[in-house]
């Protein structure tokens, strides 16, 4: 059985942290690793330990305490404590992964970008944030360092064009108040993928935001998921007709003919089916186009699987795969007669103290 421990530190806002407890007595811990999302950690602690103090100060302080889950010396995940809640005899702890720190964080300057690289601009959001006093988490960047040059505010303009006028991408203190939203918008535009990684480096933990362009992870021919070997139950393979569409229209901000919009379609060999996506947060043609393309790809109508429960097994030991990886799944054929398909790991939910890990997956060709 893997040996787990839970470590608490105090983030100092200058890129460092002070460790305050190396063996928190947590109950019901769950570690969440996510592709293109914050991830994090949830747990509870018995009431008799909920008021732990170090040097007279409480251990559990929102937006100050970080908690990490370590398995046999390897950090499997962690996050920043945001919302401790007393629930009867226990204190519930909710820790958001480091990418979630940008949520609700504002841009304090003024910047207008006509042509640029979305990945580089996303890094600028972190650099801008961490340059502020008390906002530095010590996040570093690894992996891809660039994506593609484009007119970020108007992706309908070809990158090779020299337009007379183009709508710029704006960052400013009066309207840019959620940098996590901006970061994810840039990830969708490029597109790029990312995940957060924590690892020991001597006596400190380094925090690395890993980028992949256009994707992160690899097709792992050395690993496999097989029902009856390391997959506990036959996964539910669905072919939902209500999600199928051959024509997608996205309607964003505005009214009537002035609405931001984009249409995408594909010939499928089946009857044509429409889907209308309304989202008033979409304000540019580039956003509408990216959303329509993503919706169309996800609505091909081919059989899909979304969840797997896997156990520790030589075929795929915990830690041998990461979010973003693609792994072959072999299952028993159901009414769809799907037995072998490649799935991409979008999320890993680890329950320390058990040998069972829950994976959020999608059919690889639907998300790449």
Predicted features and spans:
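Short intrinsically disordered coil segments
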Residues: 57-62, 109-114, 225-231, 265-267, ...
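Short beta-strand and beta-hairpin "edge-sheet" elements
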Residues: 24, 66-96, 195, 329-361
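A mature extracytoplasmic/lumenal domain signature
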Residues: 47, 97-99, 198, 254, ...
